[in-house]
Amino acid sequence: MMTTPIYVVDAFTNQAFKGNPAAVCVLPTSRDDIWMQHVASEMNLSETAFLHPYQDGYSLRWFTPNTEVDLCGHATLASAHILWELDHISAEQPITFYTKSGILTASKRGEWIELDFPSEQPKQENVYPNELIDGLGIQPLYVGRNRFDYLIEIDSEQRLKELNPNFSLLEQIDTRGIIVTSKSTSTEYDFISRCFFPAVGVNEDPVTGSAHCCLGPYWQEKLNKNEFLAYQASKRGGMLKIKLQHDRVFLLGQAVTVLRSELLL
């Protein structure tokens, strides 16, 4: 019987059952899209990462339970964590990932993993779907959009934490997801956020690395700084360090393996 190892990693946290869980499937060679989608649906996590050796690194693809996505931060962090944990790559060696969003790299920084991602600067939108505001039940300070998501700033951290979106309205919007953010009222964090992706089968993502490729540049202009400590205020919650340099966003997070298993196929 053919078996395939698969792991579940809690990303952007140093505690089990916090952060964002991702499944990581390490393959010897590529598998077909239908098989990968079936596995992702079976795992039923916000993302499942599939990787196999390619050139001087690894090919990496990400699937939600419903569809493939072009960029995913927490599953990339989880993939790097597993490759180092299993000694596929020495801890001193950066990992190169070949993805649909180009070449991404991961490096160890002590107990943290640093991801080198492209900046996804939002552009302000003056016209936007009614479902966006009705679905969130808020009055925005700002509405913008990049190639993936809408970005909305609101004026209250408490209001952000209390949001109870109407997902049947939000999933009608032609976008991957909706990022809602506010300046943090604490001295610990610069800003907080929540991220909703009903269109791809994930109502609320616990911690979204790729969203911070948009949040980082946005708050860089607002706060006139290049380094941030951010918190995603989902039920599980998660923390990220962010550094901006030119058109790159460096995301730093931690990860914990919580499950090792085998697919019997």
From Swiss-Prot:
Active site per the UniProt annotation: E47
The enzyme's E.C. designation: 5.1.-.-
EC category: isomerase
Keywords, sorted A to Z: Isomerase
The keyword Isomerase appears for this protein: yes
GO BP of this protein: biosynthetic process
Origin: domain of life: Bacteria
One Gene Ontology term, aspect cellular component: cytoplasm
GO molecular function: isomerase activity
Family: Belongs to the PhzF family.
Protein name: Uncharacterized isomerase BH0283
